[in-house]
Amino acid sequence: VQQITYSVLMDKHSLQAQIDALTRLHGAAECEIGVLTRFDIPELAQLSLAAYGERPTLEAQAEATDEMRLCFEGVFGTPLEGSFLGAWVDGNLVAAIIVVVDPPVEEPSGLPQVIDLMVHPNFRRRGIATALVAECARRCQDWGASSLIVRIDEANAHLPHVYDIFQESDNCAQA
């Protein structure tokens, strides 16, 4: 029986799911998943702008690039080995998931937390985000984590689709 509860914390929605359930998710086979590096920051910044519907002005590109750089520097939480994953289709970055431990706005839990999950609008509803979550869950097992926390800002227009992914795992609690 799936247990679902819900609350809003500081304009963010929270989900927590057991790793075992998430590893059983099936996502898109059309994408290649790999670890993002600092060399991917420019493309990751462009993806962020597209995913969040922002116009790609020079100022917006500079801000998105700075934000991605700060993610890699650990400003938004401590990155784990291979915890920033991307999905590529035909050599183009079309989706990304960013996972950290102990983001500064939360009480330290030691659990991995998804702080961003973005998919280019042209590639949504194809299972790519699901594939990223499943791969992230497998990596969480390698890190010794038993669950994964997701915090998504209410402003993310695709929040319902993120919830769909986690509810598919049949072992998800919203906190």
Regions found by a protein language model. Name each.
Residues 46-62, 75:
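Helix-loop element at the rim of GNAT/NAT acetyltransferase active sites that forms part
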